[in-house]
Regions:
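Basic/polar, cationic surfaces and motifs that engage anionic cell-wall
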Residues: 1-12, 66, 75-147
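Short, flexible loop/turn motifs enriched in small residues
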Residues: 33, 63-65
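Ligand-binding face of N-terminal immunoglobulin V-set domains in extracellular IgSF glycoproteins
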Residues: 70
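Short, conserved "active-site rim" segments that organize catalytic pockets and cofactor/ligand binding
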Residues: 1-55, 133
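Flexible, surface-exposed loop/gating regions in the mature catalytic domains
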Residues: 56-60
Length: 147
């Protein structure tokens, strides 16, 4: 079993109406044989296991060996701009799944994909201007600090 240091929260940067089939098609179009997430949560709150936790996925460059990747479907508005548009069902399911994962991996840090960006000013915080990307379009660290 691999050592898990992180549980990364992602958004799919896709319409909220998408399901697993649409996501798999996009991954295939990008040249990936398998989805980059271990779990995906659709707008109705359903948790879809995509890959076994023991498999290394391509969710966060440089951290994949030690990360479980979880995504909610959505994260962009009609113009493609990043937005936290999680449904109430997604919020509830995401919290429950992250709690279960953190129970299995109690030393893992729960954070958003954007929080893996380098802290270029070394103040201990990834400031908005330091972020390589906005995913998951909300601040996951304080939201799940109680888990």
């Amino acid at each position: 079993m691999r050592t898990i240091s992180y549980i990364a929260v992602h958004c799919t940067a896709s319409p909220q109406s998408w399901g697993v089939k649409e996501l798999q098609k996009v991954f295939e179009q990008r040249g990936f044989l398998r989805p980059g997430y271990h779990y995906v949560i659709t707008a109705d709150g359903e948790v879809h296991p995509m890959q076994p936790e023991g498999l290394i996925r391509n969710g966060v460059k440089g951290f994949n060996k030690e990360t479980i990747n979880v995504a909610y479907v959505g994260g962009i508005d009609a113009k493609g701009k990043g937005i936290d548009n999680r449904t109430d069902a997604q919020k509830m399911s995401l919290r429950k799944l992250l709690s279960e994962l953190h129970t299995r991996y109690p030393h893992a840090k729960i954070q958003g994909h954007r929080d893996f960006s380098p802290d270029t000013n070394h103040n201990g915080v990834v400031d908005p201007w330091e972020r390589i990307k906005e995913c998951p379009c909300f601040d996951a660290i304080p939201e799940y600090a109680d888990l």
